[in-house]
UniProtKB/Swiss-Prot annotation:
Pfam families recorded: Polysacc_deac_1
First and last residue of the signal peptide: none
Organism: Salmonella schwarzengrund (strain CVM19633)
Name listed for the protein in its UniProt record: Probable 4-deoxy-4-formamido-L-arabinose-phosphoundecaprenol deformylase ArnD
GO molecular function: hydrolase activity, acting on carbon-nitrogen (but not peptide) bonds, in linear amides
InterPro entries for the chain: ArnD (IPR023557), Glyco_hydro/deAcase_b/a-brl (IPR011330), NODB_dom (IPR002509), Polysacc_deacetylase_ArnD (IPR050248)
Amino acid sequence: MTKVGLRIDVDTLRGTREGVPRLLETLHRHGVQASFFFSVGPDNMGRHLWRLIKPRFLWKMLRSNAASLYGWDILLAGTAWPGKNIGNANAGIIRETATYHETGLHAWDHHAWQTHSGHWSIRQLEEDIARGITALEAIIGKPVTCSAAAGWRADGRVVRAKEPFNLRYNSDCRGTTLFRPLLMPGQTGTPQIPVTLPTWDEVIGPAVQAQSFNTWIISRMLQDKGTPVYTIHAEVEGIVHQPLFEDLLVRARDAGITFCPLGELLPTSPESLPLGQIVRGHIPGREGWLGCQQAASAS
């Protein structure tokens, strides 16, 4: 049996309102639990449109057929009008999710984090994280114990900024296996659970066709030599590609794969995890930098 952590990122108002309820129903039908990470502040995702001038981002949008994949309401959110507050508008849906699934913070403002966190000060990072955690805790009525950086925009500064919040784990980077981030010699931070597998929008196109994606990603899960963690998005697998995701659950079960919340991947003694650090890097299919796992020594 292969155990795969299932991470569900919720970036937008529409993803929360439409995608999450469908995912909850789908997961319930198949007896699967996952980790949901919510953006709870303003939906300004449409402001990413300026990135179309960058060739790699434009190619990604064309390759994934973004207009039909996400919908124009997502692609234009927060452009000609102020972005609506996701948490306030969908508190009931978020509370229901937290009743049945592990629930953590993705971002206060996904667009702001993805665009500006790379040059924010530690204080600005802490204030933004605190704003998101406070809002999410007010909605779900219990402490937030985990987080996942929006767009995997994380580095050593982000690791340090999250330490005051006493989270059980963070999932802020891409990598191969769980690790303890090294803050300074002799001091480690909150365990990191990296995403190890590509997302739909990173690979779909000439190399992998939509109709063969599930076969391809299941093969990658079974071949993963680390701790497999797979990310889906409420805006994609919860809406236009919900049937594809349901098919994935069936095929994965038949292949001996069990999905679980990320928290279930943590060992009883996190001190046993190897040391590592998060550095800025790049991966195929994703425009811009993101946090990547790198080995570190205690010396």
